[in-house]
C-alpha cells in the first residue's frame, strides 16, 4: 500500500470516527468503556509498581487470589468504593477519588 492510500484510509477513518462520536449514545458508551479500561490499567500498574503479586494483595485483603484477579479483570465494573479503597490501601497507597465533569449537568426528569 502506497503512502497516498494510507493517508486516504487514515482520513476516511477519522471522518468515520468523528461521525460515530457525534452520536451521543455511542460517545457515552465509548466514554464508559474507556473509563473502565483506565481504572483496570491503574489497578494493575499500581500493584506491579508496589512489587506485589495478586496472591500477596489477596493475603493483605483477607480474600482469595481469585477475588483479586476478578478485581483486576479488564472490563470488570462491579467495584464498590470500599473495595477500591481497601485494594489501594493493601498496596500501601492512599485512595483518592477524582471526578471530572465533562458536560454541564442537566436536571434530572421529575
Label for each model-derived stretch:
Residues 54, 65-66, 95:
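The DNA-contacting recognition helix of HTH DNA-binding domains
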Residues 36, 77-80:
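Short, conserved glycine- and acidic-residue-centered signature motifs
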Residues 49, 60, 90:
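Residues within the alpha-helical elements of helix-turn-helix
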Residues 61-77:
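Recognition helix of helix-turn-helix/homeodomain-like DNA-binding domains
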Residues 41-56:
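Short basic helix-loop element that most often maps to the first helix and adjoining turn
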Residues 1-38, 102-110:
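N-terminal flexible/basic segments that precede or flank functional cores
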Residues 71, 100-102:
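Short loop/turn motifs enriched for small/polar and acidic residues
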Residues 81-98:
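DNA major-groove recognition helix of helix-turn-helix/homeodomain DNA-binding modules
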Amino acid at each position: 500500500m502506497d503512502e497516498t492510500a494510507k493517508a486516504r484510509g487514515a482520513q476516511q477513518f477519522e471522518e468515520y470516527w468523528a461521525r460515530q462520536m457525534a452520536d451521543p449514545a455511542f460517545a457515552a458508551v465509548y466514554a464508559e468503556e474507556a473509563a473502565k479500561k483506565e481504572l483496570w490499567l491503574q489497578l494493575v500498574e499500581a500493584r506491579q509498581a508496589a512489587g506485589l503479586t495478586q496472591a500477596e494483595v489477596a493475603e493483605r485483603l483477607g480474600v482469595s487470589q481469585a477475588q483479586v484477579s476478578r478485581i483486576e479483570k479488564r472490563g470488570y465494573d462491579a467495584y464498590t468504593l470500599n473495595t477500591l479503597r481497601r485494594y489501594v490501601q493493601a498496596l500501601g497507597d492512599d485512595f483518592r477519588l477524582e471526578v471530572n465533569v465533562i458536560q454541564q449537568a442537566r436536571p434530572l426528569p421529575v
